[in-house]
């Protein structure tokens, strides 16, 4: 009997050792952003945040429906160009990505979203133009604040905090710039600000002396710029050069480390809004800032943390939905997610907007955006 038991135990051990390892699956998440050109710093920042999350998930080990998942990020350069963004969308769809983070630019996100919608691919943009989520698509989940929230915040801030009476608006005519400028104008008027001039530029301009000379004659209390930091930085330097006394206001796209780095001391008159609460106000946020700098040896720009949260939320949704391949089930799960990330909580309304997205106003101090304190 003793011999039989011993043999039985040996046989059981052999069977155990012969059992196959847990099945593995590679899950590819797409990323679309400007990785070259004037906005490359923002695109790389977003990519860095997503890669941090991918690396952590792979080290941690995620099991979905009995399979160990290895995540991979497929990052593509859309050059902040709508036509290129549509081409990138088709490339990512053809590569069967499970979901896409981005695009960063509203002008890219609007046409590209149609490609992703037709393919049934979940899309998690930070692009803020309200038109993105007004198309009736069920696959879009905006992981940042919209222009209505960002522009609205600055209209109220200009009157209540800066005590401004008059404002001039400069619009870069991009989908982002136009959208946030329109939302700011609506809020400004509602708060009693007088719009004394509106000027237009384009996304490639760096010389604003003509516009600023015209505005100086009208002496606005504040200037709101609907556009990106790559233009706002030279603009604010030229404001000082022209002797304008106005403050420069803008949205999340000028609330970057590059704004302070390029504009230098001139950036001290910049006030900008970002979605979410300030990271340095929570232990998790401070840890993320440190971890980012330790990993990449640069300061984060704006949305790295949202992309980090976005990847982690996708993994959470896959686990709850029990699938990495059925995109319709993943979309259904994302629609009812209540995910707690580093930047805040993520849940979405029927259009795919972030519910109750908080906003924070920042100033540039010592080259970096810091929360405004009265």
Protein language model features and the residues they cover:
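Extracytosolic ligand-binding ectodomains
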Residues: 1-8, 23-374
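Sec/Tat signal peptide C-region and signal peptidase I cleavage site
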Residues: 17-23
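Repetitive helical segments and hydrophobic/amphipathic motifs
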Residues: 11-12
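Residues in and immediately flanking transmembrane alpha helices
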Residues: 15-16, 47
């Amino acid at each position: 009997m003793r011999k039989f038991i011993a043999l039985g135990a040996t046989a059981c051990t052999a069977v155990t050792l012969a059992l196959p390892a847990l099945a593995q699956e590679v899950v590819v998440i797409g990323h679309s952003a400007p990785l070259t050109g004037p906005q490359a710093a923002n695109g790389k920042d977003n990519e860095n945040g997503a890669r941090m999350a991918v690396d952590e998930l792979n080290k941690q080990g995620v099991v979905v429906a009995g399979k160990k998942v290895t995540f991979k990020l497929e990052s593509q350069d859309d050059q902040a160009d709508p036509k290129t963004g549509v081409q990138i969308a088709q490339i990512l769809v053809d590569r069967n990505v499970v979901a896409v983070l981005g695009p960063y630019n509203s002008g890219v996100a609007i046409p590209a979203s149609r490609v992703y919608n037709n393919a049934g691919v979940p899309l998690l943009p930070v692009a803020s133009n309200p038109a993105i989520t007004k198309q009736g698509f069920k696959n879009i989940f905006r992981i940042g604040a919209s222009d209505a929230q960002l522009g609205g915040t600055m209209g109220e801030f200009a009157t209540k905090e800066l005590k401004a009476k008059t404002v001039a608006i400069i619009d870069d005519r991009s989908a982002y710039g136009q959208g946030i400028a329109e939302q700011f104008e609506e809020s400004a008027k509602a708060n009693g600000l007088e719009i004394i001039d509106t000027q237009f530029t384009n996304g490639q301009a760096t010389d604003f002396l003509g516009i600023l000379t015209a505005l100086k004659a009208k002496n606005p209390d504040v200037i709101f710029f609907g556009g990106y930091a790559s233009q706002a930085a030279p603009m604010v330097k030229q404001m000082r050069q022209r002797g304008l006394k106005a403050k420069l206001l803008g949205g999340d796209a000028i609330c970057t480390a590059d704004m302070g780095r390029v504009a230098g001391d001139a950036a001290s008159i910049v006030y900008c809004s970002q979605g979410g609460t300030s990271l340095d106000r929570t232990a998790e946020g401070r840890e993320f800032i440190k971890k980012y700098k330790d990993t990449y040896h640069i300061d984060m720009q704006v949305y790295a943390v949202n992309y980090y949260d976005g990847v982690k939320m996708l993994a959470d949704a896959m686990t709850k939905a029990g699938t990495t391949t059925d995109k319709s089930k993943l979309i259904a799960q994302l629609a009812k997610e209540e995910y707690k990330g580093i930047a805040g909580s993520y849940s979405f309304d029927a259009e795919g907007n972030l519910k109750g997205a908080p906003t924070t106003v920042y100033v540039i101090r010592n080259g970096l955006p810091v929360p405004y304190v009265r």
